[in-house]
Regions:
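Extended interaction regions within the primary functional domain
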Residues: 1, 17-20
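Bacterial N-terminal signal peptides
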Residues: 8-16
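Mature extracellular/passenger domains of Gram-negative fimbrial/pilin and adhesin proteins
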Residues: 21-335
Length: 335
């Protein structure tokens, strides 16, 4: 019995030692701060080309973030982790390029507190020492000389809104085994990209398909995904006129929408939607970069693209009677 008691006591002491050793640090303000990159006004007719690498102005100073480690931290050094949800696509000159959206790859480098260049994403990087780490006092997260590189994989046409997104979430811990659960700061990007390459569709006017009155029971009789009996597709020819885009260029047209079900745009009546298709009635799946209508500009950098559309039942249920509509956006890209 005495041997068993001594073993249990030893195990308890070991567990307590591990709890004191392993600590997760936090932003000293209690709030996760953000280092943001604005991508507006970065691109022009020269660098808006496939394969071009654009280097944003260096953030040369310290990021200005302080962390604090909890009582019980036994060491004066920390580890930093730069975590991302993006997937690394390629590495060029040690920069790890991740696909940020349909148009761009992004990569970053930074210099840490021991004056060593790092190329995130990377976890549990050993940093320098600071006596405040073990004293439960704020200390600087000494990241500086941040360099953000962008690689164009698909040139922009017109204006593209890039919503604010987090590229890296930065964590500070006292061991390389602590969980990454409390962000200290983030590195984000976003902005409105406007380039000289411009294409105007339908002379800037809205393309409208009006199907008039359709009996509600016809939609339920048609079933999910089907067009009601007696309703014919409508056809529109969309005039495309481009500026600062080479004549005879190969382009594509695709569809963007906020509410989508399979290949259909969902209307403001959730039981109903619309299919938009090419001249052969092949649907264009909204928000799918690979679902496009290819076309070629003529010698005057112009073209006409045929669109067809028809209403369908989304759910197969009898819809509530009344007007219904959906709004989509046509986007032109380079092939």
């Amino acid at each position: 019995m005495k041997i068993i008691c001594r073993l249990l006591l030893a195990m308890a002491c070991l567990c307590l030692a591990n709890i004191s050793w392993a600590t997760v640090c936090a932003n000293s303000t209690g709030v996760t701060e953000d280092e943001h990159y604005d991508l507006s006004n970065i691109f022009n007719s020269t660098n808006n080309q496939p394969g071009q690498i654009v280097v944003l102005p260096e953030k040369s100073g310290w990021v200005g973030v302080s962390a604090i480690c909890p009582p019980g931290t036994l060491v004066n050094y920390t580890y930093r982790s730069y975590v991302t949800n993006f997937i690394v696509q390629e590495t060029i000159d040690n920069y790890k390029y991740m696909q940020l959206n349909d148009y761009l790859l992004g990569a970053m480098s930074l210099v840490d507190s021991v004056m060593d260049i790092k190329f995130p994403p990377q976890n549990y990087i050993r940093m320098g020492t600071d006596p405040n780490v073990s004293q439960n006092l704020p200390f600087g997260v000494m990241d500086s000389r941040l360099i953000f590189r962008l690689k164009v994989i698909r040139p922009f046409i017109n204006m593209v809104e890039i919503p604010r997104q987090v590229m890296f979430t930065v964590y500070v811990t006292s061991t390389p085994y602590d969980p990454l659960v409390t962000p200290v700061y983030t590195i984000s990007f976003g902005g409105r990209v406007e380039v000289p390459q411009n294409c105007e569709l339908n002379a800037g006017q809205i393309v409208e398909f009006d199907f008039g009155d359709i009996g509600a029971s016809l939609f339920s009789a048609a079933g999910p995904g089907n067009r009601p009996a007696g309703v014919m597709p409508q056809t529109k020819s969309i005039a495309v006129k481009c500026t600062n885009v080479a004549a005879q260029a190969y382009l594509t047209m695709r569809l963007e929408a906020s509410a989508v079900s399979g290949q259909a745009m969902v209307s403001d009546n959730q039981d109903l939607g619309f299919i938009v298709a090419d001249q052969n009635d092949t649907p264009i799946t909204p928000n799918d970069l690979n679902s496009v209508i290819p076309f070629r500009l003529d010698a005057a950098a112009a073209a006409n693209v045929t669109l067809r559309a028809w209403p369908i039942s989304i759910t197969g249920q009898k819809p509530t009677e009344g007007p219904f509509s959906a709004l989509g956006y046509l986007r032109v890209d380079y092939q």
